[in-house]
Amino acid sequence: MRGLLARLWGGRASVSREPDARPGESGAVVSGERWLVVGLGNPGPKYAGNRHNVGFMVVDELAAQRGERWRLHKAHAQVVETRVGDAPVVLAKPASYMNLSGGPVAKLSAFYKVPVDRIIVVHDELDIPFARLKLKRGGGSAGHNGLRSITASLGSPDYVRVRVGIGRPPGRMDAASFVLQDFSTAERKELDVHVARAADAVETVVTSGLEKA
């Protein structure tokens, strides 16, 4: 998959070179440790095609690739328990609205005993053009209410972010209206590959570390 995506998109996602997830002295990821991969979005069919829901789309892709089905967890989230390489992974979609995502994420982190440094959050990013990705660990919320809620609930910003570019709104459209619109017809023609590329990046973080994604 990675070779095909590289040809289609002109190379890898741009990655912020920050400390790797649970590195040993060599910088390698410790295999067999559980990860929590959270896609952000708003629940319900009304929002399913929105730009703001691209995080849901990415974890849906990861679940579909493995033939897994979602189930409701008591932490108020849809979850899938699966594997990526040798690592057990919990995929999650909070069942709360975006600005309340932190509660379910913190509860899942506690339930599955996953520390902050093995949490990956996949979210839409206005400051990155559509069809581009950037990955980093930590940082601020940049106005993203889902990230703000997660950071507050976890008590730390030091989780990995897979920032899926949706671009800026045209003209004078406000950002809130833009993110709650469905992807345009032109964007939808490329969306499947964009989502698959983000899913591929998540897998690489889990199996090889942030610097290899």
Curated annotation (Swiss-Prot):
Keyword Nucleus part of the UniProt annotation: no
GO BP: protein quality control for misfolded or incompletely synthesized proteins; rescue of stalled ribosome
Highest taxon of source: Bacteria
Extent of the signal sequence: none
Catalytic activity: an N-acyl-L-alpha-aminoacyl-tRNA + H2O = an N-acyl-L-amino acid + a tRNA + H(+)
GO cellular component: cytoplasm
EC number of this enzyme: 3.1.1.29
Site (Discriminates between blocked and unblocked aminoacyl-tRNA): N42
PROSITE patterns per record: PEPT_TRNA_HYDROL_1, PEPT_TRNA_HYDROL_2
Subunit structure: Monomer.
Protein name (Swiss-Prot/TrEMBL): Peptidyl-tRNA hydrolase
Lineage of origin: Bacteria, Bacillati, Actinomycetota, Actinomycetes, Streptosporangiales
